[in-house]
Amino acid sequence: MALQATTTTFCFSGPTFRSTPHSLTSKRPISIKATTSSPSRLSNSRSNLKGRALSSDGSTQESPYVVCFGEMLIDFVPTTSGLSLADAPAFKKAPGGAPANVAVGIARLGGSSAFIGKVGEDEFGYMLANILKDNNVNNDGMRFDPGARTALAFVTLTNEGEREFMFYRNPSADMLLEESELDFDLIKKAKIFHYGSISLITEPCKSAHISAAKAAKEAGVILSYDPNLRLPLWPSADNAREEILSIWETADIIKISEEEIVFLTKGEDPYDDNVVRKLFHPKLKLLLVTEGPEGCRYYTKDFSGRVHGLKVDVVDTTGAGDAFVAGILSQLANDLSLLQDEERLREALMFANACGALTVKVRGAIPALPTKEAVHEALLKAVV
């Protein structure tokens, strides 16, 4: 058993979660800190459930959907790194939210994706829905809440581009998605259904999440899980650990960070393969451990290994893990046989690592997500 867009500058004159990459050979300590829209505002044209993805020459081709479920919000990113939120002279607003980032990342790489979630019936909510549409993401599964605002997150950047977050929620619209609002047709016809853990924090979204994943599983859809731990959003660390692990054994693909291994195993060594293997449940097809600039580790029932990352100048690490997920899911959606072929899986993970590396060179998450052409160019230039 396993262990249970365009940016605009705004001027403004808690508890945090810090993410820092680590190398296996350099074992530095790891710390964990603690309704439907108006038709006039959005296009309601419905995409085919087997999407029309853009190819490199601008033509369209059919591609299986990756449906992403969860939160979409506004990140406010400081224009100057190395300052506290109180001292930051200005912020740029950028669309974000891990599942939405993955959906846009897949579409930008030429795949087909859809997003299911809830935003406020406010200017930010309409902006986010239109950003999805503008990035060729099916937004038919989006819902709008007239009584709650779109979630906001203020991001503090260190001089090295690492992040701390302050969230404005409680409640925000993403927490209020109800099971009755789900687009089950979209869910059941997906190739991959991807989600995080933030949608498990409160009702009614928790029940909607569980129902959506259950429907996908029963329809034979591959389930992809990135816990994306944001500890300040949870009532307690114990509650976060319990809920994150409560759906662990239903997932087919899981991506975690070194920090999340430490958290989920209550302090065990994330560099020890025996520790990581405790998180590999019997029905899991692929477990991925991201290591920032060092790359990633991969584990299947039959093989495991590491794929080195690309070294780049870091501006902002926001969205890097989501870009990595988009990179690997875009490959798997078209060919699940990669899971049985180590050589080809390694090539797909090199592609995913490059997606993450390119994202940290630009501020914000969605604005930084790369195209397939940019990824291939970076790989060609990389020194092995």
Swiss-Prot record:
It comes from the Eukaryota. Pathway: Glycan biosynthesis; starch biosynthesis. Transmembrane segments: none annotated. It holds the Pfam family PfkB. GO terms for cellular component: chloroplast; chloroplast stroma. Keywords: ATP-binding, Carbohydrate metabolism, Chloroplast, Kinase, Nucleotide-binding, Plastid, Transferase, Transit peptide. One of its GO terms (biological process) is starch biosynthetic process. It is found in: Plastid, Chloroplast. Residues 1-46 form a transit peptide. It catalyses: D-fructose + ATP = D-fructose 6-phosphate + ADP + H(+). One of its GO terms (molecular function) is fructokinase activity. Residues 35-48 have a biased composition (Low complexity). The keyword Transit peptide applies. This is Probable fructokinase-6, chloroplastic. May play an important role in maintaining the flux of carbon towards starch formation. Its EC number is 2.7.1.4. Residues 34-61 are annotated as: Disordered. Belongs to the carbohydrate kinase PfkB family.
